[in-house]
């Protein structure tokens, strides 16, 4: 399926999708520019896109592949692609793989995850199959035991390893522990989460002849986001023109940012998806234009709509729902998600503010109030782990630190200095 004109896509979505029809109800009939349109609210979007009787889809779900987005069970979010849309998706992404350093004849191990409606393994495998250069694909998967993965990589002389940073680092640790040398590996393609400096050092030790680069920037819900830009900064990508339009919007006003170096949130419009239109959809990341080339931008981390902790994706709504379910007494009046990185792993802290007048909000030094807060903290963590079971699974696997709760007074919660609005997610990890 080829990309379509934006104005045609808007008209089609308005006419055939009940969700977009309602969203654009107050707009003039000829609204045909992105700036004419509101930004999609993720909560209402996914509430409307139920597995049955979706109000987002423009037609019946009779020919498509269904994928799950959000990374877990609980309240699953489903993203659908027709066969033509998927072909366009993987062909465009496959073209971008050349920018990563993929060369003719490269033997590429796909170490992303498969099954349970997850897309990453199939997506990378299909993108490699549609790449404009010949390559040899090794569909190993991220769930295969490292004890068998390493001999397979050695015996088949794999030259490129593609996977999440977490998977690549676990492999690197096993390589170093076993003393095996995978001398043929020359390229490490990472995706799905940020690659930090401590991880780069580990990968360089295990694979001294390999360079780590971004495999590209995409998601199963938002679609095509960024094609890799060769260079020293793996965070820099460029838009997949003409298949998608990337905007960077001001955090306070939602006005498009045009000048380099000014951070904002990433919003994407897919020009090739018609069954499940994606128009001004928040990708969940923050970025800034670099000014180094047309459409070049640097990814800066996750935005408020979502957060990535190691291999786990969470939405702020997940944490809010967990607090609402556990806090039957209404003790919590504010919440922030704080993502930190220490000892080589990511960790998520739930910063909870108690009701005004609780002068001991930041203390847990005994007494009935402290006991109630401790019990509430355990209940909130249990609720969130139930909704996002991949998190405790990742804790047990050693990928991330356990969830924790940090108590605060409401005035201690970080706010936007320009608007006074609460900042839902604080990403305190290094950006490079």
Question: Model-predicted segments: where are they?
Answer:
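Nucleotide 5′-phosphate-binding alpha/beta core
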Residues: 1-68, 74-91, 95-99, 349, ...
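Proline-centered flexible-loop/turn and helix-kink motifs
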Residues: 18, 25, 133, 208-209, ...
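Active-site phosphate/ATP/adenylate-binding loop shared across adenylate-forming ligases
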Residues: 46-187, 194-202, 206-207, 229
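Generic structural signal for residues in well-ordered beta-strands
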Residues: 135-137, 212-213, 246, 335, ...
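AMP-binding/adenylate-forming catalytic core of the ANL superfamily
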Residues: 161, 267, 272-395, 420
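A short, hydrophobic beta-strand element of the alpha/beta-hydrolase
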Residues: 189-190, 216
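Conserved AMP-binding/adenylate-forming
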Residues: 195, 201-292, 304-305
């Amino acid at each position: 399926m080829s990309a379509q004109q934006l104005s045609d896509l808007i008209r089609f979505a308005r006419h055939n999708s009940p969700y977009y029809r309602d969203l654009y109800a107050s707009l003039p009939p000829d609204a045909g520019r992105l700036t004419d349109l509101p930004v999609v609210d993720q909560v209402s979007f996914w509430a409307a896109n139920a597995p049955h009787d979706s109000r987002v889809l423009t037609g019946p779900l009779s020919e498509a592949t269904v994928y799950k987005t959000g990374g877990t069970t609980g309240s699953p979010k489903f993203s659908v692609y027709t066969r033509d849309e998927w072909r366009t998706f993987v062909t465009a992404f496959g073209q971008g793989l050349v920018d990563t350093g993929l060369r003719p004849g490269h033997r590429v191990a796909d170490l992303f995850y498969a099954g349970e409606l997850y897309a990453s393994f199939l997506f990378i495998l299909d993108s490699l199959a549609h790449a404009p250069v010949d390559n040899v694909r090794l569909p190993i998967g991220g769930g295969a035991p490292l004890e068998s993965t390493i001999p397979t990589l050695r015996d088949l002389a794999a030259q490129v390893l593609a996977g999440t940073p977490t998977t690549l680092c676990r492999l690197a640790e096993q390589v170093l522990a076993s003393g095996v040398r995978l001398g043929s590996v020359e390229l490490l393609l990472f995706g799905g989460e940020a690659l930090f400096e401590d991880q780069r050092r580990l990968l360089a030790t295990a694979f001294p002849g390999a360079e780590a680069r971004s495999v590209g920037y995409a998601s199963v819900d938002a679609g095509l986001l960024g094609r890799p830009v060769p260079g020293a900064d793996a965070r820099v990508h460029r838009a997949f023109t003409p298949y998608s339009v990337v905007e960077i919007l001001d955090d306070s006003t939602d006005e498009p940012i045009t000048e380099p170096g000014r951070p904002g949130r990433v919003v994407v419009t897919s020009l090739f998806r018609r069954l499940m239109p994606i128009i001004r959809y928040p990708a969940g990341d923050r970025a800034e234009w670099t000014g180094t080339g047309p459409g070049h931008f640097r990814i800066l981390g996750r935005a408020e709509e979502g957060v990535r902790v190691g291999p786990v994706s969470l939405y702020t709504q997940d944490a809010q729902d967990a607090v609402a379910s556990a806090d039957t007494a209404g003790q919590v009046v504010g919440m922030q998600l704080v993502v930190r990185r220490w000892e080589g792993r990511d960790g998520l802290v739930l910063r909870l503010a108690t009701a005004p007048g609780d002068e001991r909000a930041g203390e847990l030094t005994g007494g009935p109030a402290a006991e109630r807060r401790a019990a509430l903290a355990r209940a909130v963590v249990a609720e969130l782990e139930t909704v996002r079971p991949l998190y405790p699974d990742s804790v047990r696997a050693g990928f991330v630190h356990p969830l924790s709760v940090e108590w605060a007074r409401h005035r201690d919660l970080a706010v936007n200095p320009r608007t006074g609005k609460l900042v839902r997610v604080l990403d305190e990890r290094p950006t490079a």
